[in-house]
Amino acid sequence: KLEQALRAAGSNEIGGVLAAEQIGDGRFLVVDLSIQSDGTISDFKRDPIQHREFIQRFHSRMGHRPERFNYLGEWHSHPNYPAIPSEADIQQMQDLVEDVEQASTFLVLMVIKLSEDASLRGTIYGFRPQLGPVRGRLRGPENTLIKEEFEPIIVMPARRKTDDS
């Protein structure tokens, strides 16, 4: 579902929410995700009403067992940029997890893209109130690793000391 949506979106950002099953202590299996496809080449803004309805339908399908099946967090694509959260993404997630109406003890953000070889590449971060983001590990279907996206680091050569500096 995700790969097909990423292919269809091409160079436009898309996103949605992640619905998951808790399969162990701190371990979750994403069992469904919503897809909103109206982003641009450099921006995605989620529609809260669409995703709230998706989570309500998810709870109904799973028998209203929120201790096992629940909203895990958000996802969106960065087809034209590294699949890492921007500063705005991080701030938005921190604001979400600290929103008292949200009532979550933690949320995740997955940023994903299709790489040139059509494989998934991305990152996932966890957010908790009053704490900084923590990077997690993504696994794909059949427990395959999704290629990790790394932040580019620019190394600047040291300035040479001259006689007049």
Regions found by a protein language model. Name each.
Residues 1-73, 77-165:
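MPN/JAMM (Mov34/JAB) isopeptidase/deubiquitinase module and associated MPN-bearing subunits/adaptors
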